[in-house]
Amino acid sequence: MSYPGYPPTGYPPFPGYPPAGQESSFPPSGQYPYPSGFPPMGGGAYPQVPSSGYPGAGGYPAPGGYPAPGGYPGAPQPGGAPSYPGVPPGQGFGVPPGGAGFSGYPQPPSQSYGGGPAQVPLPGGFPGGQMPSQYPGGQPTYPSQINTESFPSYPVFSPVSLDYSSEPAAMTQGTQGTIRPAANFDAMRDAEILRKAMKGFGTDEQAIVDVVANRSNDQRQKIKAAFKTSYGKDLIKDLKSELSGNMEELILALFMPPTYYDAWTLRKAMQGAGTQERVLIEILCTRTNQEIREIVRCYQSEFGRDLEKDIRSDTSGHFERLLVSMCQGNRDENQSVNHQMAQEDAQRLYQAGEGRLGTDESCFNMILATRSFPQLRATMEAYSRMANRDLLSSVSREFSGYVESGLKTILQCALNRPAFFAERLYYAMKGAGTDDSTLVRIVVTRSEIDLVQIKQMFAQMYQKTLGTMIAGDTSGDYRRPLLAIVGQ
């Protein structure tokens, strides 16, 4: 069986970040590569990282927790939404809590990087190559000190069948975003349209949407430069003065360079009291090596802080070690598959979990943090044949809390990354209230990468289109740009 690899995807690098200690919260003049013919943008325009969380959801009630997954894989759960096509229904991925609005952003002194994770010895295989006849220990008992208020009952993916015949075309034919560079693009003309939309009394939000939601991120950077050249004003400051709430968050996110947006989001997730762990998981466990390395550099230069040290100070235990491994950006990205290694890794993972009392967490961390996604898919198939239980189910049995969510996110992305984001979007809108920050973040960050495939998986998994669910869960000026981006 072949295991098609993921083509390199993601955000284009931004090679020239400003030095540490820069005052502005957005790239200052002369640092990011702006197009020739336009002067570089000034700093200080983007909203600075708040003391905690994302902007409020504009009156929506805070999203509540979802019921915990029940039992092990088997019959579909009644009422649940399907996980991947052709497999039992799952319950999905939780959403981070909301937070306060925008506020000032401190500029602390720069910090140096810490050391990377140490090499972890792997346990050996089974004696004589034979599998244990029973699973010793049964269901693990989780530590009693875990605070259930800190670990709400978020839904998680149901384990999936390893039938790769149901994989979408995106797995073998590349992925596509819904936003493409506009033809006959004229930055000066677009700048003039935006100026007229914000001039005088009132704001023409539709004109803003027509421009912003139909230009690529690179074209938006050119529009910003053209706006300052033509009018001597900062476009971002003008937009902030004219917009508010979720509409403001969405439009400003679209104008941030992708690497900066990820770094800015990570800083917000760890700023102030509390940590948005699921935001850390969503970014660090799904990005490519190049994207992660660019995020680390941008985080240091923009905020004068070391990402790894912030992770260490805001997380702990095996979850901390997993995220530190992720922020190294050292996953093997070779698209070929070593089937012998896959078999050996499957045995090691079994012996580190189901095949012993307790769990060797370091073995799971090492394999899931270093192997390529095609290699992990082969390992998952070998594990399923060997253990008569899929690896996602075993992770659920052996781990709990955010480390479980992080490990499962890696495996879910190895199987089908668009399906992972489709489920995140579904549970951001399911039930009372909307997790608008998750909705905005995924729609914006995937709009030029794989939002086409995410839409396809969403419709296949939930029997409704992404646009239909967005239209029913949002309203007004905020709804229009979201629908324009997803292609409704």
UniProtKB/Swiss-Prot annotation:
SUPFAM superfamilies: Annexin. Keywords: Acetylation, Annexin, Calcium, Calcium/phospholipid-binding, Repeat. Residues 1-18 have a biased composition (Pro residues). One of its GO terms (cellular component) is cytoplasm. Belongs to the annexin family. Calcium/phospholipid-binding protein which promotes membrane fusion and is involved in exocytosis. A pair of annexin repeats may form one binding site for calcium and phospholipid. This is Annexin A7. It comes from Macaca fascicularis (Crab-eating macaque).
